Amino acid sequence: MRFKGLDLNLLVALDALITERNLSSAARKINLSQPAMSAAVARLRKHFRDELFGMRGRELVLSSRAEGLAAPVREALMHIELSIMARHPFDPARLNRRFRIVLSDFVTVVLFRNVVARVTREAPAVSFELAAPTDEHELLLRRGEVDFVIRPDFFMSSTHPRAALFEERLVCVGCCTNRELQPRLTFDRYMSMGHVAVKHGGAPRTPVEHSFLTDLGPTRRIDILVQSFSMIPPLIVGTNRIGTMPLGLVRHFQRTMPLRIVELPHPFPAFTEAVQWPSLHNSDPGSLWMRDILFQEATRMATTQELRVTSSPEDAEPPGHFVRSVSPLP
Protein backbone atom coordinates (compact mmCIF):
# COMPACT_ATOMS: atom_id res chain seq x y z
CA MET A 1 0.00 0.00 0.00
CA ARG A 2 1.27 3.44 -0.91
CA PHE A 3 0.49 6.82 0.60
CA LYS A 4 1.71 9.94 -1.19
CA GLY A 5 4.43 7.97 -2.92
CA LEU A 6 5.60 6.06 0.17
CA ASP A 7 5.17 2.32 0.55
CA LEU A 8 3.71 2.09 4.07
CA ASN A 9 5.56 -1.18 4.65
CA LEU A 10 8.70 0.94 4.75
CA LEU A 11 7.41 2.63 7.91
CA VAL A 12 7.43 -0.76 9.63
CA ALA A 13 11.04 -1.22 8.53
CA LEU A 14 11.94 2.31 9.66
CA ASP A 15 10.40 1.75 13.08
CA ALA A 16 12.31 -1.52 13.52
CA LEU A 17 15.59 0.13 12.50
CA ILE A 18 15.05 3.03 14.91
CA THR A 19 14.15 0.70 17.76
CA GLU A 20 16.81 -1.98 17.27
CA ARG A 21 19.67 0.27 16.04
CA ASN A 22 21.07 -2.77 14.22
CA LEU A 23 20.34 -3.88 10.67
CA SER A 24 20.31 -7.63 11.39
CA SER A 25 18.21 -7.30 14.55
CA ALA A 26 15.71 -5.04 12.79
CA ALA A 27 15.42 -7.51 9.91
CA ARG A 28 14.76 -10.39 12.30
CA LYS A 29 12.17 -8.37 14.20
CA ILE A 30 9.96 -7.94 11.12
CA ASN A 31 10.88 -11.24 9.45
CA LEU A 32 12.88 -9.81 6.56
CA SER A 33 16.14 -11.07 5.12
CA GLN A 34 19.13 -8.79 5.62
CA PRO A 35 19.35 -7.98 1.87
CA ALA A 36 15.65 -7.04 1.90
CA MET A 37 16.21 -4.77 4.90
CA SER A 38 19.20 -3.15 3.18
CA ALA A 39 16.99 -2.49 0.17
CA ALA A 40 14.37 -0.94 2.46
CA VAL A 41 17.01 1.38 3.91
CA ALA A 42 17.96 2.51 0.41
CA ARG A 43 14.33 3.23 -0.45
CA LEU A 44 13.79 5.12 2.81
CA ARG A 45 16.85 7.27 2.15
CA LYS A 46 15.61 8.05 -1.33
CA HIS A 47 12.11 8.98 -0.15
CA PHE A 48 13.18 11.19 2.76
CA ARG A 49 16.24 12.56 0.93
CA ASP A 50 18.34 11.92 3.99
CA GLU A 51 20.92 9.33 5.02
CA LEU A 52 18.77 8.55 8.11
CA PHE A 53 21.40 6.18 9.54
CA GLY A 54 25.14 6.18 9.96
CA MET A 55 27.27 3.39 11.41
CA ARG A 56 29.28 3.15 14.62
CA GLY A 57 30.66 -0.37 14.59
CA ARG A 58 27.54 -2.50 14.18
CA GLU A 59 25.26 0.09 15.73
CA LEU A 60 23.07 2.34 13.61
CA VAL A 61 23.36 6.02 14.51
CA LEU A 62 20.27 8.08 13.75
CA SER A 63 20.47 11.33 11.81
CA SER A 64 18.50 14.29 13.14
CA ARG A 65 15.86 13.55 10.50
CA ALA A 66 15.49 9.96 11.72
CA GLU A 67 15.34 11.20 15.32
CA GLY A 68 12.47 13.47 14.34
CA LEU A 69 10.63 10.63 12.60
CA ALA A 70 10.92 8.15 15.48
CA ALA A 71 7.97 9.19 17.63
CA PRO A 72 5.51 10.05 14.80
CA VAL A 73 6.20 6.77 12.99
CA ARG A 74 5.84 4.72 16.20
CA GLU A 75 2.62 6.52 17.07
CA ALA A 76 1.16 6.02 13.59
CA LEU A 77 1.92 2.30 13.65
CA MET A 78 0.51 1.97 17.15
CA HIS A 79 -2.75 3.65 16.10
CA ILE A 80 -3.04 1.22 13.18
CA GLU A 81 -2.32 -1.74 15.45
CA LEU A 82 -4.84 -0.61 18.07
CA SER A 83 -7.51 -0.09 15.42
CA ILE A 84 -7.02 -3.65 14.20
CA MET A 85 -6.89 -5.12 17.72
CA ALA A 86 -10.05 -3.27 18.80
CA ARG A 87 -12.07 -5.57 16.54
CA HIS A 88 -11.08 -8.63 18.60
CA PRO A 89 -11.45 -9.24 22.36
CA PHE A 90 -8.11 -9.06 24.16
CA ASP A 91 -6.92 -12.48 25.31
CA PRO A 92 -3.62 -12.53 27.24
CA ALA A 93 -3.32 -16.28 26.74
CA ARG A 94 -2.89 -15.61 23.00
CA LEU A 95 -0.67 -12.54 23.36
CA ASN A 96 2.75 -12.86 21.69
CA ARG A 97 4.69 -9.78 22.69
CA ARG A 98 7.95 -8.69 24.28
CA PHE A 99 7.62 -5.95 26.89
CA ARG A 100 10.64 -3.67 27.27
CA ILE A 101 10.92 -2.34 30.81
CA VAL A 102 13.41 -0.05 32.56
CA LEU A 103 13.73 -0.89 36.26
CA SER A 104 16.28 -1.30 39.04
CA ASP A 105 17.67 -4.47 40.59
CA PHE A 106 15.72 -3.56 43.72
CA VAL A 107 12.35 -3.50 41.92
CA THR A 108 13.26 -6.67 40.05
CA VAL A 109 13.84 -8.58 43.28
CA VAL A 110 10.99 -7.29 45.45
CA LEU A 111 8.26 -6.97 42.81
CA PHE A 112 8.99 -7.90 39.24
CA ARG A 113 10.00 -11.52 39.74
CA ASN A 114 6.44 -12.11 41.00
CA VAL A 115 5.09 -10.32 37.93
CA VAL A 116 7.14 -12.61 35.68
CA ALA A 117 5.88 -15.71 37.47
CA ARG A 118 2.28 -14.63 37.05
CA VAL A 119 2.67 -13.63 33.40
CA THR A 120 4.29 -16.99 32.65
CA ARG A 121 1.11 -18.68 33.88
CA GLU A 122 -1.40 -16.34 32.23
CA ALA A 123 0.38 -15.46 28.97
CA PRO A 124 3.11 -18.01 28.20
CA ALA A 125 4.05 -16.40 24.86
CA VAL A 126 4.89 -13.05 26.51
CA SER A 127 8.57 -12.27 27.08
CA PHE A 128 10.50 -9.41 28.67
CA GLU A 129 13.55 -7.30 27.97
CA LEU A 130 14.71 -5.60 31.17
CA ALA A 131 17.12 -2.65 31.18
CA ALA A 132 18.84 -0.76 33.99
CA PRO A 133 17.74 2.83 34.68
CA THR A 134 19.49 5.60 32.78
CA ASP A 135 19.11 9.35 32.50
CA GLU A 136 17.51 8.89 29.06
CA HIS A 137 14.26 7.23 30.10
CA GLU A 138 12.16 10.20 28.95
CA LEU A 139 13.71 9.95 25.48
CA LEU A 140 13.05 6.21 25.41
CA LEU A 141 9.41 6.81 26.33
CA ARG A 142 9.02 9.53 23.72
CA ARG A 143 10.39 7.26 21.00
CA GLY A 144 8.24 4.37 22.18
CA GLU A 145 11.39 2.28 22.63
CA VAL A 146 10.29 1.03 26.05
CA ASP A 147 6.88 -0.03 27.29
CA PHE A 148 7.37 0.91 30.94
CA VAL A 149 9.78 2.74 33.22
CA ILE A 150 9.65 1.88 36.94
CA ARG A 151 11.51 4.42 39.08
CA PRO A 152 10.98 6.70 42.08
CA ASP A 153 8.24 9.11 41.12
CA PHE A 154 10.39 12.23 41.49
CA PHE A 155 12.39 11.11 38.44
CA MET A 156 9.32 10.70 36.25
CA SER A 157 8.70 12.78 33.15
CA SER A 158 5.74 15.14 33.21
CA THR A 159 4.91 14.42 29.56
CA HIS A 160 3.76 10.80 29.94
CA PRO A 161 1.13 9.13 32.14
CA ARG A 162 2.24 7.43 35.35
CA ALA A 163 0.86 5.74 38.46
CA ALA A 164 2.17 4.88 41.92
CA LEU A 165 3.07 1.27 42.69
CA PHE A 166 4.37 1.12 46.27
CA GLU A 167 6.22 3.07 48.93
CA GLU A 168 9.69 2.26 50.18
CA ARG A 169 12.34 3.79 52.39
CA LEU A 170 16.06 3.52 52.96
CA VAL A 171 17.67 1.88 55.99
CA CYS A 172 21.19 1.25 57.17
CA VAL A 173 22.34 -2.37 56.96
CA GLY A 174 25.34 -4.22 58.31
CA CYS A 175 26.45 -7.69 59.33
CA CYS A 176 25.02 -9.15 62.55
CA THR A 177 28.61 -9.54 63.80
CA ASN A 178 29.39 -5.84 63.26
CA ARG A 179 29.86 -4.53 66.82
CA GLU A 180 30.23 -0.96 65.60
CA LEU A 181 26.67 -0.96 64.28
CA GLN A 182 24.65 0.03 67.34
CA PRO A 183 20.81 -0.08 67.52
CA ARG A 184 20.81 3.72 67.81
CA LEU A 185 23.21 4.90 65.16
CA THR A 186 24.50 8.46 65.55
CA PHE A 187 25.09 10.65 62.55
CA ASP A 188 28.83 10.92 63.24
CA ARG A 189 29.17 7.15 63.56
CA TYR A 190 27.20 6.61 60.36
CA MET A 191 29.40 9.01 58.38
CA SER A 192 32.69 7.66 59.77
CA MET A 193 32.03 3.95 59.24
CA GLY A 194 33.19 2.32 56.03
CA HIS A 195 30.42 2.26 53.42
CA VAL A 196 29.65 0.08 50.44
CA ALA A 197 27.85 2.59 48.23
CA VAL A 198 26.06 2.49 44.90
CA LYS A 199 27.49 4.60 42.12
CA HIS A 200 24.73 6.15 40.01
CA GLY A 201 26.11 7.74 36.88
CA GLY A 202 29.16 9.69 37.93
CA ALA A 203 28.08 10.14 41.56
CA PRO A 204 28.88 7.78 44.46
CA ARG A 205 25.29 7.85 45.71
CA THR A 206 21.91 6.75 44.51
CA PRO A 207 19.36 9.40 43.51
CA VAL A 208 17.13 8.59 46.49
CA GLU A 209 20.05 9.22 48.84
CA HIS A 210 20.83 12.58 47.27
CA SER A 211 18.65 14.88 49.37
CA PHE A 212 19.50 13.01 52.58
CA LEU A 213 23.23 13.43 52.13
CA THR A 214 23.20 16.82 50.40
CA ASP A 215 21.14 18.43 53.14
CA LEU A 216 23.46 17.10 55.85
CA GLY A 217 26.66 18.19 54.19
CA PRO A 218 29.54 15.89 55.21
CA THR A 219 30.83 13.15 52.98
CA ARG A 220 30.64 9.48 53.93
CA ARG A 221 33.71 7.29 54.14
CA ILE A 222 33.21 5.10 51.07
CA ASP A 223 35.34 1.97 50.96
CA ILE A 224 33.71 0.23 48.00
CA LEU A 225 31.64 1.52 45.08
CA VAL A 226 29.25 -0.87 43.34
CA GLN A 227 26.80 -0.69 40.45
CA SER A 228 23.64 -1.89 42.20
CA PHE A 229 22.02 -2.36 45.61
CA SER A 230 22.17 -6.15 45.25
CA MET A 231 25.96 -6.04 45.38
CA ILE A 232 26.02 -4.46 48.84
CA PRO A 233 25.04 -7.39 51.14
CA PRO A 234 27.77 -9.84 50.02
CA LEU A 235 30.38 -7.13 50.57
CA ILE A 236 29.33 -6.23 54.12
CA VAL A 237 28.81 -9.74 55.54
CA GLY A 238 31.68 -10.63 57.88
CA THR A 239 33.00 -7.03 57.89
CA ASN A 240 32.47 -3.80 59.82
CA ARG A 241 31.22 -2.00 56.72
CA ILE A 242 27.67 -0.76 56.30
CA GLY A 243 25.39 0.14 53.42
CA THR A 244 22.25 2.16 52.74
CA MET A 245 19.54 0.19 50.96
CA PRO A 246 15.78 -0.06 50.42
CA LEU A 247 14.17 -1.94 53.31
CA GLY A 248 12.36 -4.47 51.11
CA LEU A 249 15.59 -5.53 49.42
CA VAL A 250 17.38 -6.00 52.74
CA ARG A 251 14.53 -8.22 53.93
CA HIS A 252 15.02 -10.35 50.85
CA PHE A 253 18.72 -10.85 51.56
CA GLN A 254 18.08 -11.50 55.25
CA ARG A 255 16.68 -14.90 54.28
CA THR A 256 20.16 -16.10 53.36
CA MET A 257 22.58 -13.65 54.98
CA PRO A 258 23.19 -12.53 58.61
CA LEU A 259 22.15 -8.90 58.14
CA ARG A 260 21.08 -6.36 60.73
CA ILE A 261 18.82 -3.42 59.89
CA VAL A 262 19.19 -0.13 61.74
CA GLU A 263 17.37 3.15 61.27
CA LEU A 264 19.30 5.91 59.54
CA PRO A 265 20.46 8.55 62.02
CA HIS A 266 18.52 11.35 60.34
CA PRO A 267 14.87 11.22 59.21
CA PHE A 268 14.56 10.35 55.54
CA PRO A 269 11.09 10.34 53.97
CA ALA A 270 9.67 7.32 52.19
CA PHE A 271 9.78 7.45 48.42
CA THR A 272 7.23 6.12 45.94
CA GLU A 273 8.16 3.70 43.19
CA ALA A 274 5.97 4.48 40.19
CA VAL A 275 5.40 3.13 36.71
CA GLN A 276 5.33 5.29 33.60
CA TRP A 277 4.43 4.39 30.03
CA PRO A 278 4.44 6.22 26.67
CA SER A 279 1.39 8.37 26.03
CA LEU A 280 0.79 6.54 22.76
CA HIS A 281 0.39 3.27 24.73
CA ASN A 282 -2.27 4.69 27.02
CA SER A 283 -5.13 2.72 25.44
CA ASP A 284 -3.09 -0.26 24.25
CA PRO A 285 -4.86 -3.42 25.56
CA GLY A 286 -1.55 -5.18 26.20
CA SER A 287 -0.20 -2.21 28.15
CA LEU A 288 -3.45 -1.95 30.13
CA TRP A 289 -3.27 -5.63 31.00
CA MET A 290 0.35 -5.38 32.12
CA ARG A 291 -0.41 -2.31 34.22
CA ASP A 292 -3.19 -4.18 36.01
CA ILE A 293 -0.78 -6.99 36.84
CA LEU A 294 1.81 -4.50 38.14
CA PHE A 295 -0.78 -2.79 40.35
CA GLN A 296 -2.17 -6.07 41.68
CA GLU A 297 1.24 -7.54 42.46
CA ALA A 298 2.38 -4.30 44.12
CA THR A 299 -0.71 -4.37 46.35
CA ARG A 300 -0.12 -8.05 47.14
CA MET A 301 3.49 -7.29 48.06
CA ALA A 302 2.49 -4.47 50.41
CA THR A 303 -0.15 -6.65 52.05
CA THR A 304 2.37 -9.45 52.58
CA GLN A 305 4.77 -7.01 54.24
CA GLU A 306 2.02 -5.88 56.61
CA LEU A 307 1.24 -9.49 57.52
CA ARG A 308 4.90 -10.20 58.26
CA VAL A 309 5.07 -7.38 60.76
CA THR A 310 1.80 -8.29 62.52
CA SER A 311 2.55 -12.05 62.58
CA SER A 312 2.94 -14.06 65.79
CA PRO A 313 6.19 -13.73 67.83
CA GLU A 314 7.53 -17.09 66.63
CA ASP A 315 7.46 -15.74 63.06
CA ALA A 316 9.24 -12.49 63.92
CA GLU A 317 12.70 -11.50 62.73
CA PRO A 318 15.70 -12.79 64.74
CA PRO A 319 16.88 -10.59 67.66
CA GLY A 320 18.79 -7.52 66.64
CA HIS A 321 16.91 -7.09 63.36
CA PHE A 322 14.85 -3.96 62.96
CA VAL A 323 11.64 -4.33 60.98
CA ARG A 324 8.95 -1.79 60.24
CA SER A 325 6.14 -2.13 57.76
CA VAL A 326 6.06 -0.30 54.47
CA SER A 327 2.66 1.29 54.18
CA PRO A 328 0.61 0.11 51.21
CA LEU A 329 -0.69 2.70 48.83
CA PRO A 330 -4.28 3.80 49.48
From Swiss-Prot:
Residues 6-63 form the HTH lysR-type domain. One of its GO terms (biological process) is regulation of DNA-templated transcription. Residues 23-42 bind DNA. GO terms for molecular function: DNA binding; DNA-binding transcription factor activity. Residues 308-330 are annotated as: Disordered. NodD regulates the expression of the nodABCFE genes which encode other nodulation proteins. NodD is also a negative regulator of its own expression. Binds flavonoids as inducers. Keywords: Activator, DNA-binding, Nodulation, Repressor, Transcription, Transcription regulation. This is Nodulation protein D 2. Belongs to the LysR transcriptional regulatory family.
